[in-house]
Regions:
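Nucleotide-sugar donor-binding/catalytic module of glycosyltransferases
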Residues: 1-227, 231, 329
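C-terminal subregions of glycosyltransferases and related glycan-biosynthesis enzymes
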Residues: 169, 174-179, 183-184, 201, ...
C-alpha cells in the first residue's frame, strides 16, 4: 500500500456491461493508492448504475454517483463529472467504464505531476470476451502544436493536476462527435506546465462491440469513399441535413473548426503572457493557410499524420471558407464563457 495525497477518479458511465463494469471497479478498489474518491457521472437514469455500484463495491464510500437522468453524450458527461470534483483533490484521473487498471497505475503516474500538468501512459489492447491481447498502444508526445493537430492523449490513460479545471471548464461547445474531452484537456495542459507521455503499461484497453470510439490509434482507416459516407451520415445527424452546405459545415468542424474552437477558447481563459502566437497562426481565429500547410508537411514527414489526414484537413479549411466557419466558431466561443 502507498500513501499519497487525496485525488479524484472521474468515471463516465452509460448503460455499462455488468461484467466489464465489475472488473473495472474491482481494479480501482485494488489500487495501491487508496486515498481517492471515484465520481461516477451517469449519462441517463442513474438508478440502475447506482444499484450496480452498491452491489459491486459492497457499499465502498469512495464511490459517488452524479447525474439527474439527462442524456448529455460522452463528452459532456465527462464535463459533468469534472464539475463534481472535490476541491480537496490534488490529482484527477479519467476512467472508462469497461477497461481494467493495473494495481499500481496511479502510484506510477502520480510523481510526474510534480513536473507537468498532465501525464499519459500506454495500454495493452485486449479483445473481449476472448481476453486476447491484440496489441499495445504506442502514444507519443510530439509537442503542443502537433498535439493540437493530432491528439495522442487518451483520457483513460491520463492523470492530471486540478489546476487545469479553472481553464478547462466549461468545455468548449461543439458537436459531441467532433469534440473530445481528452484532446481539450491535453491542449489546456500544454498551455500550463506541459504534458508528458511515458512508456509504462498501466491498464488493459478493452475492445468490444459497444466501445464509443475504440482504440484511437486504429481509427481513420478505410477508403475515401467510406470517409465521404461517414461525413454525410454525421452531417445528417449533427447538422440536420445531407445538403452540400451541411456537409461543408460538418467537414469544417471535424478538423479546422474544432481546433480553432479550442485555441480561441483557451486564449480567452489564460493570461496574455501564455498566449502562443505560433499556435494562433496555425489554429486560431487569425489562422493562415500557409502556416497550417507548413505544419502539415512537417507532420507528414515525421509520420505524425497520414497523407489522407493532411488532405482532409485542407479540405476542411476550404469548407470553412465557404460555410462561414470562422464566424461560427466565434459564436461557439462566446457561448462557452466560464
Amino acid at each position: 500500500m502507498s500513501t499519497s495525497p487525496f485525488g479524484t477518479i472521474v468515471l463516465a458511465a452509460y448503460s455499462p456491461d455488468p461484467e466489464l463494469f465489475r472488473r473495472q471497479l474491482a481494479s480501482l478498489r485494488a489500487q495501491s493508492v487508496e486515498d481517492w474518491e471515484c465520481v461516477i457521472s451517469v449519462d441517463g437514469d442513474p438508478a440502475p448504475v447506482a444499484a450496480l455500484v452498491e452491489e459491486i463495491t459492497e457499499g465502498d464510500g469512495r464511490f459517488r454517483i452524479v447525474g439527474d437522468g439527462s442524456r448529455l453524450g460522452f463528452y459532456l458527461n465527462f464535463e459533468r463529472g469534472l464539475l463534481a470534483v472535490s476541491e480537496r483533490s490534488t490529482w484527477i484521473a479519467l476512467c472508462d467504464q469497461d477497461d481494467r487498471w493495473d494495481a499500481d497505475k496511479i502510484e506510477r503516474l502520480l510523481p510526474h505531476l510534480d513536473e507537468v500538468s498532465l501525464v499519459s501512459a500506454q495500454a495493452r489492447i485486449v479483445s473481449y470476451p476472448s481476453e486476447k491481447e491484440t496489441g499495445r498502444t504506442a502514444r507519443q508526445d510530439h509537442g503542443p502544436l502537433f498535439t493540437l493537430l493530432s491528439n495522442e492523449f487518451t483520457g483513460s490513460l491520463c492523470l492530471f493536476a486540478p489546476e487545469l479545471l479553472a481553464t478547462a471548464l466549461p468545455f468548449p461547445r461543439a458537436s459531441t462527435r467532433v469534440a473530445t474531452h481528452d484532446h481539450w484537456l491535453a491542449v489546456v495542459a500544454a498551455a500550463h506546465r506541459g504534458t508528458r507521455i511515458v512508456d509504462d503499461l498501466v491498464q488493459d484497453y478493452v475492445q468490444h462491440d459497444a466501445n464509443v470510439f475504440g482504440d484511437p490509434s486504429r481509427l481513420g482507416g478505410g477508403s475515401i469513399r467510406q470517409s465521404v459516407r461517414n461525413i454525410r451520415d454525421q452531417a445528417e445527424r449533427y447538422e440536420g441535413s445531407r445538403s452540400p452546405r451541411a456537409i461543408a459545415r460538418m467537414t469544417f468542424w471535424t478538423y479546422v473548426g474544432w481546433r480553432q474552437l479550442m485555441v480561441d477558447t483557451l486564449d480567452r481563459r489564460i493570461p496574455e503572457s501564455r498566449i502562443d502566437a505560433r499556435r494562433d497562426r496555425v489554429f486560431g481565429d487569425g489562422r493562415r493557410f500557409r502556416a497550417a500547410s507548413a505544419l502539415l508537411r512537417v507532420a507528414r514527414r515525421r509520420g505524425i499524420v497520414p497523407a489522407r489526414f493532411a488532405l482532409e484537413y485542407r479540405a476542411s479549411w476550404l469548407c470553412g471558407a465557404i460555410s462561414g466557419g470562422r464566424r461560427a466558431v466565434r459564436r461557439a466561443v462566446a457561448a462557452a464563457r466560464p
